[in-house]
Amino acid sequence: MGQKVNPVGFRLGVIRTWDSRWYAEADYSKLLHEDLKLRNFLKKRLYNSGVSKIEIERAANKAKINIYTARPGLIIGKKGAEVETLKKELAKLTDKEIYLNIQEVRKPELDAQLVAENVALQLERRVAFRRAMKKSVTSSLKFGAKGIRITCSGRLGGAEMSRTEWYREGRVPLHTLRADIDYGFAEAKTTYGIIGVKVLIFKGEVLPGQK
């Protein structure tokens, strides 16, 4: 049943850690909704900046947000002007003191979320789905991935009936908990409807004692 479960959630506490790191008792649901609001806002606001992951850490009335992106320059802006504007917007949204930490994703070809978004973008630009999948698989393997699987689901190529097609190269061990598997999901909004794109990238095994 390894293919039915989210590979990131499956490995939490084993080789992966949580994207939200804070503790609360009475305010738990309020802070959880605030996290969702922050993530949705940042995803929309930084749509063209290639954001892969957003981590949130909290302490008292402060929040530290780590943004992992393929294009840090776009978020930081000239002399940090953009990042200051973003900080003010987030502070207004949450009524909290916000610290932003922008981290660069050095190899976007090995980041499942960025690969999924790239395939979705190509599908929106009417690139043939098989070509888009194959191109992403080839470039990920070239940059050192041990295995990759891309699944596209929907009205592929404008077909009357929706279907699911996938393409895999290398190993993608879904049951092995020590396997470092990255997972990403994106949606392509085409004229025929929405096409879902799922990407699984196997980067190697994490041995005990390593993180």
Swiss-Prot record:
Q: Name one Pfam family in it.
A: Ribosomal_S3_C
Claim: Lyase is one of the keywords in the record: no
Q: Which SMART domains match?
A: KH
Q: Which GO terms describe its molecular function?
A: mRNA binding; rRNA binding; structural constituent of ribosome
Asked if the record carries the keyword Protein transport, the reply is no
Which keywords are on file for this protein?
Ribonucleoprotein, Ribosomal protein, RNA-binding, rRNA-binding
Quote a single Gene Ontology cellular component term.
cytosolic small ribosomal subunit
**KH type-2 domain location, by residue?**
38-106
Q: Which domain of life is it from?
A: Bacteria
Which CDD domains does this entry report, sorted A to Z? KH-II_30S_S3
Q: Any signal peptide, and if so, which residues? A: none
* Gene3D superfamilies (UniProt xref): 3.30.300.20, Ribosomal protein S3, C-terminal domain
What Gene Ontology biological process does one annotation of this record name?
A: translation
Assembly description: Part of the 30S ribosomal subunit. Forms a tight complex with proteins S10 and S14.
Report the sequence similarity comment from the record.
Belongs to the universal ribosomal protein uS3 family.
* Record-linked NCBIfam families: rpsC_bact (TIGR01009)
Recorded hits in PANTHER family, A to Z, give: 30S/40S RIBOSOMAL PROTEIN S3, SMALL RIBOSOMAL SUBUNIT PROTEIN US3C
Q: What does this protein do?
A: Binds the lower part of the 30S subunit head. Binds mRNA in the 70S ribosome, positioning it for translation.
According to UniProt, the name of this protein is: Small ribosomal subunit protein uS3
Organism of origin is: Geobacter sulfurreducens (strain ATCC 51573 / DSM 12127 / PCA)
